[in-house]
Structure formats: C-alpha cells, structure tokens
Design a protein with these regions (language model features):
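Beta-rich ligand-binding surfaces for carbohydrates and other polyanions
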Residues: 2-269
Length: 269
C-alpha cells in the first residue's frame, strides 16, 4: 500500500474536490459524488475468505507506471494496458458513469467508453473479482452525509449488497464505524459504532414479532424488508430499468442504491 507520491497531484485533487482517502487498502468502491479516486500507487483489496465467504482474493492496483491492473485469486485477470503512458496516473469515475484513468495533470489515457445520464455513479471491485460500474443512484437513505473514521482500516468487511441476495437477521453491511443491521425485531438500522450509544443514523422503523425477517434487493433496484416468508414490511419504492443493482454503505454514512450495471469487465449473463 503506497501513498500519493506527487504533491502537485495532491493539490490538484484537493482543488477539484477529489477525496483520495490514502490508506484505504481494504476499500473497493470509487464514487463520482462526492468524488473519490484510486491514486498513483494505491490499491484496492478485497478478501472475504477469513469470513468464510468462498471467493478468491481480489485487488485492483493503480501502478506507478500508469497501468491499472486487476488480480483475482493470485492471477492477473485484466488491465488497461496503459503502461508508460504517463506519470502519477489515477482512476476516477465521472457524473456520466465513465471510468477514466488520467495522467498528471488531466490528460485521459484510458476510458471505459460507456456513458449514461448525469447522476451519481459507483465503480466497484465486485464480489466475483470483476469490475463493474453501477448507476445512476436511484435511492438514498435520508440521513445527512458525513465523514467516516479517517483511520485506515485493513480489515475487509462487506459493504455492498447485490441484487438476487437475501440476508436474514444480523449484520448486513459494515464500513469502518458504520454498520447496517437487521435487528431481531425486524427494524433495519444504520448505526455509528464509534459512539457509546451506537447512534442510529437511519432506520426503517419496521417491526415484526415473528423474528423471521430478511432483506432483499430486486434486480430493478428496489430494497425490501420482508417477514412471514414474503410479506412486505418496508420497501424503498424506487426502481430502474435494470436486471442488476447494488446497495452500497458509503464512506459518508449514506446507504445508496445504484443501478443498472453500466459497464463491466465480464458480463454476468
Ligand atoms: C482460487 O485458486 C485456488 C487454488 O489455485 C482454486 O482451488 C480455487 O478454485 C480458485 N477459486 C476461484 C474462485 O477461482
Ligand atoms: C490488454 O491486453 C491484453 C493482452 O493483449 C488483452 O487481452 C486485453 O483485452 C487488453 N485490455 C484492454 C482493456 O483492452
Ligand atoms: C475507447 O474509445 C477510444 C476512442 O474511440 C478508443 O481508442 C479506446 O480503445 C476505447 N477504449 C476501450 C476500453 O474500449
Ligand atoms: C492490520 O494492521 C495492523 C497494524 O498495522 C497489524 O498489526 C495487523 O496485523 C493488520 N491486520 C491484518 C489482518 O492485516
Ligand atoms: C413506499 O410506499 C408506501 C405506499 O405508498 C408508503 O407507505 C411507504 O412509506 C413508502 N416507503 C418509503 C421508504 O418511502
Ligand atoms: C439483462 O441482461 C441481459 C443479458 O446480458 C442483457 O442483454 C440485457 O440488456 C439486460 N437488461 C437490462 C434491462 O439491463
């Protein structure tokens, strides 16, 4: 894990509001809004095998030689092939959903070449070791955005939930000091675990005495809290024309649903 090497680049990124989050070794999402970047020499890393989730280790590395390289389960699986095209190259995603590798200062050396309407987008190192761009955002929790614990964490936790997943009572997602939990009484709550009282930042205010609830995300991006096998306790009510979406617990404490999948290194179908 390396840190940004170029002061001019840092100033540039700050000038343009890009939040680099050095030390984000176990992160695996880049956002268009508020913007984040994978900076020169930085790497994303994803490994849930210690938590008995049987996918291989994945990493995405913005190499100092300007090549953006994806590794999965020990092998190189994809690259932008931009070696030697510039110095201080970094990866961002823009408000049209296009991923761009730029060299110092702003010259693009690689683009994903798929654009969509203006909105908020997320670039994910996915659970299966592939890359995916999702958006625009179709739903967001109503709490105020804020900055998470600035301390870097090297513990991988899962903070993305995909369509076709079903999760029972318990921890749903965790990002640093933020945790989304489906409680035993069927209330879906977003907590700040840094506070003694575990402040609730957002909740569905749902209740069921049956202790059998679960959450699902439909392919069209609608999030549900259900119980009694399939009865709906809560729904997000926003949908998009999509067959695959992602719910992300972002670094600013907001839950956001992005869909459809606009670009990927390997289609699911
Ligand atoms: C990862 O590599 C190991 C050892 O080479 C192999 O047994 C395993 O099936 C691979 N996992 C995936 C998801 O490809
Ligand atoms: C990079 O080069 C490899 C090997 O030539 C090729 O298979 C791959 O498609 C290229 N990547 C991109 C993004 O074009
Ligand atoms: C994107 O489009 C440019 C210009 O047409 C082309 O040179 C480049 O190879 C394309 N990139 C990908 C990843 O397809
Ligand atoms: C995380 O970082 C700390 C301090 O650098 C180190 O002691 C610990 O072993 C690391 N844990 C993992 C799982 O890498
Ligand atoms: C979704 O719509 C239902 C029915 O109109 C409404 O009762 C519920 O409050 C809405 N949910 C949200 C999260 O807005
Ligand atoms: C759903 O997946 C199929 C198969 O890849 C694809 O052709 C189609 O465009 C997708 N539909 C939507 C609405 O995204």
């Amino acid at each position: 894990m390396a840190f940004p090497t170029s002061v001019p680049l840092l100033i540039l990124l700050l000038t343009f509001g890009l939040l680099g989050r050095p030390g984000s070794a176990t992160d695996f999402v880049i956002y268009s809004d508020p913007p984040t970047a994978l900076l020169p020499g930085q790497m994303f890393h994803y490994d849930l095998t210690p938590q008995d989730i049987p996918y291989g280790r994945a990493s995405l590395v913005m190499k100092p030689d300007c090549n953006l390289v994806l590794y999965f389960n020990g092998s190189k699986t994809w690259a932008t092939n931009t070696t030697g095209l510039g110095d201080n190259c970094y990866l961002t995603i823009d408000s049209h959903g296009e991923a761009i590798v730029q060299r110092n200062i702003h010259y693009p050396v690689w683009r994903s070449n798929k654009t969509s309407v203006v909105g908020s987008y997320a670039f994910l190192l996915q659970w299966n070791g592939e890359l995916g761009i999702y958006g625009p955002a179709i739903w967001s929790s109503s709490n105020e955005g804020e900055l998470s614990d600035p301390k870097p964490s090297n513990i991988t936790t899962d903070y993305v939930f995909y369509s076709y997943s079903v999760l029972p009572i318990g921890k749903i997602l965790e990002y640093k000091n933020y945790r989304l939990v489906l409680r035993d009484d069927c209330n879906l709550v977003l907590l700040d675990t840094n506070t003694n009282t575990q402040d609730i930042k957002w909740q569905t205010n749902t209740y069921s005495p049956l202790h059998d609830c679960f959450i699902t995300l439909d392919p069209n991006g609608e999030l549900f809290v259900k119980h009694n096998r399939r009865d709906i306790l809560w729904r997000s009510n926003e949908t998009t024309n999509s067959n695959f979406s992602a719910l992300v617990l972002r670094y600013d404490a907001k839950l956001v649903i992005y869909g459809p999948q606009l670009w990927t290194t390997k289609p699911l179908w």
